[in-house]
């Protein structure tokens, strides 16, 4: 990235840990956009092996979800994970290292255009106190739940690298 002159992106990589990686999880090679996605995939594979979920997949959509007639971004959305629960229910999980306004816009559009889809928001960590509380409150309107990944990763310990 430095060669291309994206200094701001370089800073984001340092602060947020958004380093793409290629890793094997569940016997398959995956191209993750960030370390958070890699760790979450390990957690989902752990749940699958423990028979807590039926299956999971990453960036498995042949094309993005389009928001027809929308002129202002976002006009399309590609979710991170698809989790199939043991009863066959499919849940879309969106992972975010930092919860921002555009994330809520995507969630709101998904709820409007694809109301049959179940969404969950997975945050790298949920700050204590009021920081980001309004964004989380808004996101709760469009998601089944918001998950704090840092709590899960602490509980998993050495099982997730």
Task: Locate predicted features.
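Electrostatic, structured charged patches in enzyme active sites and in nucleic-acid/phosphate-binding
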Residues: 1-161
């Amino acid at each position: 990235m430095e060669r291309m002159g994206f200094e701001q992106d370089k800073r984001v990589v340092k602060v947020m840990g958004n380093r793409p990686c290629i890793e094997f999880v569940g016997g398959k090679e995956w191209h993750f956009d960030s370390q958070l996605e890699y760790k979450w995939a390990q957690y989902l594979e752990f749940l699958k092996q423990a028979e807590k979920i039926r299956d999971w997949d990453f960036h498995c959509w042949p094309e993005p979800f389009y928001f027809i007639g929308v002129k202002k971004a976002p006009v399309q959305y590609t979710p991170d994970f698809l989790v199939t629960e043991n009863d066959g229910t499919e849940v879309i999980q969106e992972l975010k290292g930092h919860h921002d306004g555009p994330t809520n816009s995507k969630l709101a559009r998904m709820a409007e255009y694809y109301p049959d889809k179940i969404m969950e928001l997975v945050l790298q960590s949920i700050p204590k106190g009021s920081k980001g509380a309004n964004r989380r409150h808004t996101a709760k309107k469009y998601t089944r739940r918001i998950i704090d990944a840092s709590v899960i990763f602490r509980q998993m310990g050495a099982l997730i690298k």
